[in-house]
């Protein structure tokens, strides 16, 4: 039965509303966290994730808000260029051209010795791996396109969605620490058993995600004006979550996470200071000694953040749960 055009227009309008575009982004982010926790090409959940990513790409293009994309296309251009490069490598070439390319001599010699006629071959020596890499780009491309369709206010909420999912992975990792090495809480067959990998298959993925969450929490903690509602709750809640994340990065055993943690923490402190405190410095100075005292208390607070962070890191190392530090200095074989 043919759907009337008026009904199609109504459906398109509903699917293209700002709220629906945000829900689509949030849903896709949840799907990625639940099914895209590994980089291996034999993970079964990729059968679900990648086709859905392509569908979300189609949705993002269909409801594209041109004014939202303007001036923000550079990351997409990079991703599309990579996809084009991979697609070119899959184009079959005639034997004469393929055999003349660098690194193909041994294949041509084997074919001559076996008296096998050379077929048309793609540029890549591993078509399956190249095809896997090509389809893997569907996930970041879909995420970028869905994010570009969001309005400014919704983009702020999108960061909150990411932080929430990061905290879910953190809590999941904490439960993994309390279980056995073969606990069913590990979602992937090939994983870092014994490490708090959360919703991921690899300790590095979990640690880097937590590092990103630190920066986002720094932004979130100071994202509102000081007079806004619940601004203090967001500030202290965001900082408290940073303190919760820091020891777990040590425990993951990820050298990448350990090395990136310090600059991420510095970035979070800078975001909090410049977005929340420094912006009020000039009017505060005009208010007299009380404002100066207020500013001084905030400086003490930031200094306390640094001291508390160092203390937490020291405790993690002291109690011998810092596998990341052991691996970094070469005292661990894992």
Question: What residue ranges belong to the model's regions?
Answer:
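Charged, glycine/proline-rich intrinsically disordered loops and linkers
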Residues: 101-123, 281-295
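Extracytoplasmic catalytic/substrate-binding loops of multi-pass membrane glycan-assembly enzymes
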Residues: 333-334
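Transmembrane alpha-helix boundary signature
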Residues: 61-71, 87-103, 114-123, 181
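Alpha-helical transmembrane segments of multi-pass inner-membrane proteins
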Residues: 2-36, 50-60, 83, 90, ...
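Short, hydrophobic transmembrane alpha-helix segments
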Residues: 34-47, 62-69
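Membrane-interface helix-loop-helix modules in multi-pass membrane proteins
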Residues: 70-76, 82
């Amino acid at each position: 039965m043919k759907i009337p055009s008026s009904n199609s227009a109504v459906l398109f309008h509903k699917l293209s509303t700002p709220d629906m575009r945000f829900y689509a982004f949030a849903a896709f982010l949840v799907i990625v966290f639940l099914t895209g926790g590994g980089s291996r090409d034999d993970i079964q959940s990729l059968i679900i994730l990648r086709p859905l990513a392509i569908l979300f790409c189609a949705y993002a293009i269909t409801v594209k808000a041109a004014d939202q994309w303007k001036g923000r296309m550079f990351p997409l251009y990079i991703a599309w260029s990579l996809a084009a490069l991979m697609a070119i490598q899959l184009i079959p070439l005639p034997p004469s051209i393929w055999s003349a390319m660098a690194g193909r001599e041994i294949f041509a010699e084997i074919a001559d010795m076996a008296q096998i006629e050379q077929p048309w071959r793609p540029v890549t020596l591993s078509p399956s791996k190249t095809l896997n890499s090509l389809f893997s780009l569907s996930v970041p491309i879909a995420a970028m396109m869905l994010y570009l369709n969001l309005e400014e206010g919704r983009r702020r909420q999108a960061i909150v969605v990411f932080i929430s999912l990061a905290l879910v992975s953190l809590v999941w990792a904490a439960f993994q620490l309390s279980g056995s090495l073969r606990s069913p809480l590990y979602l992937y067959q090939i994983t870092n058993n014994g490490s708090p990998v959360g919703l991921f298959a690899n300790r590095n993925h979990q640690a880097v995600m937590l590092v990103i969450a630190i920066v986002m929490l720094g932004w979130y903690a100071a994202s509102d004006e000081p007079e806004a509602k619940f601004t203090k709750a967001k500030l202290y809640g965001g900082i408290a979550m940073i303190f919760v994340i820091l020891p777990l990065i040590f425990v993951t055993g990820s050298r990448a996470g350990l090395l990136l943690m310090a600059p991420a923490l510095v970035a979070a402190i800078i975001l909090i200071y410049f977005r929340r405190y420094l912006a009020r410095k000039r009017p505060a100075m005009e208010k007299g000694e009380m404002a100066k005292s207020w500013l001084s208390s905030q400086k003490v607070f930031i200094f306390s953040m640094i001291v508390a962070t160092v203390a937490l890191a020291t405790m993690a190392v002291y109690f011998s749960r810092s596998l990341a530090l052991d691996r970094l200095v070469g005292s661990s074989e894992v």
